[in-house]
Amino acid sequence: MDKLLERFLNYVSLDTQSKAGVRQVPSTEGQWKLLHLLKEQLEEMGLINVTLSEKGTLMATLPANVPGDIPAIGFISHVDTSPDCSGKNVNPQIVENYRGGDIALGVGDEVLSPVMFPVLHQLLGQTLITTDGKTLLGADDKAGIAEIMTALAVLQQKNIPHGDIRVAFTPDEEVGKGAKHFDVDAFDARWAYTVDGGGVGELEFENFNAASVNIKIVGNNVHPGTAKGVMVNALSLAARIHAEVPADESPEMTEGYEGFYHLASMKGTVERADMHYIIRDFDRKQFEARKRKMMEIAKKVGKGLHPDCYIELVIEDSYYNMREKVAEHPHILDIAQQAMRDCGIEPQLKPIRGGTDGAQLSFMGLPCPNLFTGGYNYHGKHEFVTLEGMEKAVRVIVRIAELTAKQN
């Protein structure tokens, strides 16, 4: 464990923020820098079959150290950080033996407060790694990377019995592209775990069904003084569309297994307006109903418009709930839960109100639930991780490898 913190601080020093709307994968040069660093480290550790694809997927194998027909299992994390907040010049603060109260983030007015983030009350006495209030931290998912790399070192150094262990580090997870170029056949694992979760004990095998909705509204602009019966205000149509979307089914009004409609962006003029929604729901039927609802709203608002004015709606599915795939292989969850209990951790099975690479991989033939990293408040300047949580994640990864070998 001695190098766990060192690894993490090294990885977050690299700016690997991904970028939406870019065709190339990885979408940013910084991701390549981390991928090449990890490739070098994996080779130095003596792993075999170390490959880095042209689309930025890094794979490697820690060979089995015991005989027998032991299934190969995998551990996966992503190298990019969220586009929602800067990942440049990350300056972590290490708060040892947290005693409660507000933590000043850097020299400004930003604080990490238990009033806003009550989970801090549960972390007294632990070592917290925070931001300086200017960037995100990058624990999502560089904590996962550091934990996988450290677990590999522990398996080697302590000669713990294990089968073949596959590891992979992917790009552009935050913009939904990483898993699309993942070669499941080349990875050659029976199942895998993404290490991309949150607080200690979290084990996730349910995620949202997800879709994006892009709405293009074309109006007609004339001088306001002579506009009666002629002007068609695209912004007014956009407002009418949003007024039809259920207000109590938005992200800020929902939790747990509740789905939502989220207006992520809206821009425009009288002549032209564009709206971007995301739709999320755990239930597949409700997910389809939400998509139909958006189509009905667009049709209703667009009824009777002049032929040169129109509303165009495009819906694209992003990913689906992996529960239906992971549930076919209950032993994957059983092993993870047993590993946590063996490490003194009570498993917390909870839904992911989001998505992971594992969701897409599960539908590509690689069942892939999600393990905790020990991090909190991802995608923003209040992000932090506990060193103790990271250490527990390492122990769980090692124990999963050990249990898989023992059960076969």
Curated annotation (Swiss-Prot):
<protein>
    <recommendedName>
        <fullName>Peptidase T</fullName>
        <ecNumber>3.4.11.4</ecNumber>
    </recommendedName>
</protein>
<dbReference type="GO" id="GO:0008270">
    <property type="term" value="F:zinc ion binding"/>
</dbReference>
<comment type="similarity">
    <text>Belongs to the peptidase M20B family.</text>
</comment>
<dbReference type="GO" id="GO:0043171">
    <property type="term" value="P:peptide catabolic process"/>
</dbReference>
<dbReference type="InterPro" id="IPR002933">
    <property type="entry name" value="Peptidase_M20"/>
</dbReference>
<keyword id="KW-0963">Cytoplasm</keyword>
<keyword id="KW-0378">Hydrolase</keyword>
<comment type="function">
    <text>Cleaves the N-terminal amino acid of tripeptides.</text>
</comment>
<keyword id="KW-0479">Metal-binding</keyword>
<dbReference type="GO" id="GO:0005829">
    <property type="term" value="C:cytosol"/>
</dbReference>
<feature type="active site" description="Proton acceptor">
    <location>
        <position position="173"/>
    </location>
</feature>
<keyword id="KW-0482">Metalloprotease</keyword>
<dbReference type="GO" id="GO:0008237">
    <property type="term" value="F:metallopeptidase activity"/>
</dbReference>
<feature type="active site">
    <location>
        <position position="80"/>
    </location>
</feature>
<dbReference type="Pfam" id="PF07687">
    <property type="entry name" value="M20_dimer"/>
</dbReference>
<dbReference type="InterPro" id="IPR010161">
    <property type="entry name" value="Peptidase_M20B"/>
</dbReference>
<dbReference type="InterPro" id="IPR036264">
    <property type="entry name" value="Bact_exopeptidase_dim_dom"/>
</dbReference>
<feature type="binding site">
    <location>
        <position position="196"/>
    </location>
    <ligand>
        <name>Zn(2+) 1</name>
    </ligand>
</feature>
<dbReference type="GO" id="GO:0006508">
    <property type="term" value="P:proteolysis"/>
</dbReference>
<keyword id="KW-0862">Zinc</keyword>
<feature type="binding site">
    <location>
        <position position="140"/>
    </location>
    <ligand>
        <name>Zn(2+) 1</name>
    </ligand>
</feature>
<dbReference type="InterPro" id="IPR001261">
    <property type="entry name" value="ArgE/DapE_CS"/>
</dbReference>
<feature type="binding site">
    <location>
        <position position="174"/>
    </location>
    <ligand>
        <name>Zn(2+) 2</name>
    </ligand>
</feature>
<dbReference type="InterPro" id="IPR011650">
    <property type="entry name" value="Peptidase_M20_dimer"/>
</dbReference>
<dbReference type="Pfam" id="PF01546">
    <property type="entry name" value="Peptidase_M20"/>
</dbReference>
<keyword id="KW-0031">Aminopeptidase</keyword>
<feature type="binding site">
    <location>
        <position position="78"/>
    </location>
    <ligand>
        <name>Zn(2+) 1</name>
    </ligand>
</feature>
<feature type="binding site">
    <location>
        <position position="140"/>
    </location>
    <ligand>
        <name>Zn(2+) 2</name>
    </ligand>
</feature>
<dbReference type="GO" id="GO:0045148">
    <property type="term" value="F:tripeptide aminopeptidase activity"/>
</dbReference>
<keyword id="KW-0645">Protease</keyword>
<feature type="binding site">
    <location>
        <position position="379"/>
    </location>
    <ligand>
        <name>Zn(2+) 2</name>
    </ligand>
</feature>
